[in-house]
């Protein structure tokens, strides 16, 4: 399996281990498989049997081996077995699926150590990083940005691993108290939290700026764990397949997915699964008030907001105005035209494809629908689901459920809403909606009172670089 950059007209090939530790391509593009593997009906049957008889880790290994040709198959199997196990995940199913309403399901992705769907990819990424760094005899300094859940998932996946340090940028004051406690309460000499004066997109821009400095990146061994890293998406591919298997009886049955998203990472994995030939019907983009992606799928205009225009909402992990993974989909939508993709994404204020002949394919060929949700929508959905069904949703998952219900008349297949996090991470909104505090899983007892470890910084890439430089030097 070769990988190519979305901005490279020459389609220069790279292997999985070439791109694993780096994140962005040297030209600033994002990596994708040169060709998506195509799965047969026999393969789908084998995967169904594997999940049923051997479990999630075994299914993950079979899927991931399609994308990783330069690591021995038995090593991939061992890596997956270490990543997806109990008690790291609180259930042996790893990703259970339950029915919420008639033909509306929840794919439970928050059974990992930080109670967020990001654990699904990060636990695997941690195992791959340690494997490859050990093989090379190298070290790595991970630089990431988080709007809430990526940071804690990355830190819990990487802590204690030899040769790995984490520098995680967060938007100051824009995470919930629980999210801050999860990250800033982690006491590990190789974990470095930075509270940046800005919003998530400012954090992400600094990550990209540092990654684009080839000399600095090479000298200080900078790696990435944000969803710009291909391995994150590769891991997410697996749970689309497992959810499809769990609610179907045969390979002819299709399933749709409603995905709360701001960065277009999680749903991009669904797009790839659909391109592989797995029977997925519609992919529903569910946004909050920061509806950049919903606006694109409705109008063809991708209109990037400024930091000042990025709203602070009650589903904060989606408070994003520039979707860093969107380039991967646009590359496919434009027939993998790298030159045009590079031109479009060099326009910092966005672009429009409203009059482009390719735009209708977003819905017609690639199956996308979209919708947005407000604070009132979230609160009402959480309250209704709790009072009527006895199920408590976090605000992001509530966005996904609300949008899925609103588009129900356009979807003829069962819909799986992918859970974002457990409600405990967003207690203020849960209390507003239900009048009660969400349950605190036992593994988080005492987290709110732990000492904090965080460094405040201005929105300045040079300052962040200097902090990395001084920290690495010791």
What kind of feature is each model-predicted range?
Residues 1-474:
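PLP-dependent amino-acid enzyme catalytic core
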